[in-house]
């Protein structure tokens, strides 16, 4: 089994992630950085056509949620858009966690491409909103070596395609 698995949340697993992340971040930082996103996730536990879903990037080794992922599939099911990846506050120290963050994003891309439930979707895109995100996307692009897939930039989008 892979270290990471992209799985649906249920109320229990989302509540557990919320409790653990709040303990790591502290109450004030959690309220500022994550509270609104967890409230959104509670309303997006099931996949509805044309709407986004909250998914759990579950660390199977440590038995924890390392990131919350927002994905939406196009109405035709040909492409998924990776809208957000919210890493756990345990990765806030970007200077010491950069390799871990690149691994998180790589695992998210791989899992979205190969996970059942996204119809015939075989293309995933992520937008580099700022210079830091573009730097992470460039790192992922340079390290990408998963067979039968292709990673390429389309402007500020990093696009992954399963052949």
Q: What would you call each of these model-derived segments?
A:
Residues 1-96, 115-125, 129, 138-163:
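Non-catalytic substrate-recognition and accessory regions of acyl/acetyltransferase enzymes
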Residues 94-114:
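Conserved acetyl-CoA-binding loop-helix of GNAT-fold acetyltransferases
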Residues 133-134:
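Short, well-ordered alpha-helical microsegments
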């Amino acid at each position: 089994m892979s270290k990471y698995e992209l799985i649906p949340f249920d109320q229990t697993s989302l509540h557990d992630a919320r409790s653990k992340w709040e303990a790591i971040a502290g109450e004030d930082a959690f309220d500022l950085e994550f509270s609104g996103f967890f409230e959104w996730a509670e309303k997006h536990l099931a996949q509805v056509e044309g709407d986004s879903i909250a998914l759990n990037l579950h660390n199977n080794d440590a038995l924890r949620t390392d990131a919350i992922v927002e994905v939406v599939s196009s109405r035709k099911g040909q492409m998924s858009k990776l809208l957000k990846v919210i890493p756990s506050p345990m990765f806030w120290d970007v200077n010491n966690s950069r390799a871990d963050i690149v691994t998180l994003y790589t695992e998210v891309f791989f899992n979205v491409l190969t996970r059942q439930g996204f119809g015939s979707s075989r293309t995933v895109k992520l937008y580099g909103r700022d210079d830091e995100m573009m730097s992470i996307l460039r790192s992922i692009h340079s390290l990408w070596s998963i067979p039968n897939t292709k990673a390429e930039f389309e402007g500020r989008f990093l696009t992954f395609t399963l052949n």
